[in-house]
Each structure stands twice: as C-alpha cells, then as structure tokens.
C-alpha cells in the first residue's frame, strides 16, 4: 500500500445489455490505457453503491441507467497497483440518454460474449472480472439487492472508563 492509496478500494460496475451484447468502455488513463472495462467507478462520500453505478454510467457513457439487481461481488486482495478492490457489479438497464465517448473513454460499444472473450485472450480487458461478470449475467445470476445493507453510521460510544472521574 502506498501513502496515497487506501488499503482497499470499493468499485461499482454496470452490466448494460442490449440484444445480447454488453456495453464496454475503453480506458484512456494509465495503468489501464487502451483496456476495455465495464462502465465503473468509485462511490463518492454519502453515495450508495447503486447511486454510484448510475452516476458512473452517465459520466462514462452518456446513458441514464436504472440499477435492476446485483450480479456479483468480487474481491481482489491485491491488484497490480498495490491496493485491494471489492467490486459490486450491477445489472442496469438504459432509461435514457445518448451513448457517447469522452476524453477518459475514447471508445464505447456493445460487444458479444465471444468478442469479450477475444479481448480477454488478447490481454485487452481491465481485468478478469469483466468476463466473469458477463458470464454470470448470461447464466442468470441474480443476487438480492438486500445483499448489501445500507446502515446509518453513528459515532462510536465512548470507551468505558474514559469519563472524567468525580473527585
């Protein structure tokens, strides 16, 4: 772990399917330059995982999506960048917007499972999670949205004995 990075990063990815094809975006920044990935990113403070997935889809593809269900949760204890990743993959449907490219994602498009497998064999996917998620989605894997529970985070109570002594 480096001083700039947390030990584990949370990611939220979208599986957006049209006609049996899966939407991928091409990355433009190192260390993933030119690699294809699911539309994905990190939640901002105060944002739920599903809200982060919706925002990231809009930012990366121009599409407004609605999260349907959770397909998978992947944990990579250590990436090549020296951090751990826990990635929540959601099946999302297009609710509006127009598909577009951006500076960060110079190519976006729908790919068949076979094309995604070819990208994987050629080392052109961001990670093995892309193929795994596509295969799990195609197999009909659905995790209940309640798998991830939203909780209120209150300050921890004062430890015993930390109160001032009367005297």
PLM region spans:
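A structural signal for short, well-ordered beta-strand segments
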Residues: 14, 70, 90-92
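A generic structural micro-feature
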Residues: 4-8, 35, 80-86, 102-105
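Conserved Nudix-box catalytic region and its N-terminal flanking loop in Nudix hydrolases
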Residues: 18-59, 167
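Short connector loops at helix/strand junctions that flank enzyme active sites
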Residues: 9, 17, 38, 65, ...
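Active-site-adjacent beta-strand/loop module that shapes the phosphate/pyrophosphate-binding cleft
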Residues: 75-98, 109, 115, 134-137
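Nudix hydrolase/Nudix homology domain
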Residues: 31, 104-167
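Conserved N-terminal beta-strand and adjoining loop/helix that marks the start
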Residues: 1-23, 74
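A short coil-to-beta-strand element that immediately follows conserved catalytic motifs
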Residues: 64-72
């Amino acid at each position: 772990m480096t001083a700039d990075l947390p030990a584990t990063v949370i990611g939220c990815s979208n599986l957006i399917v049209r006609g049996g094809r899966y939407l991928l975006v091409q990355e433009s920044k190192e260390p993933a330059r030119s690699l294809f990935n699911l539309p994905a990113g990190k939640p901002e403070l105060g944002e739920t995982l599903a809200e982060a997935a919706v925002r990231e889809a809009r930012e990366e593809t121009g599409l407004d999506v609605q999260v349907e269900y959770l397909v998978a949760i992947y944990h990579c204890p250590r990436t090549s960048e020296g951090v751990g990743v826990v990635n929540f993959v959601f099946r999302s449907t297009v609710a509006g917007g127009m598909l577009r490219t951006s500076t960060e994602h110079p190519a976006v498009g729908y790919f068949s499972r076979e094309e995604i497998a070819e990208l994987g064999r050629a080392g052109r996917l961001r990670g093995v999670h892309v193929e795994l998620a596509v295969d799990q989605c195609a197999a009909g894997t659905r995790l209940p949205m309640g798998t991830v529970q939203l909780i209120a985070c209150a300050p921890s109570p004062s430890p015993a004995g930390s109160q001032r002594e009367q005297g």
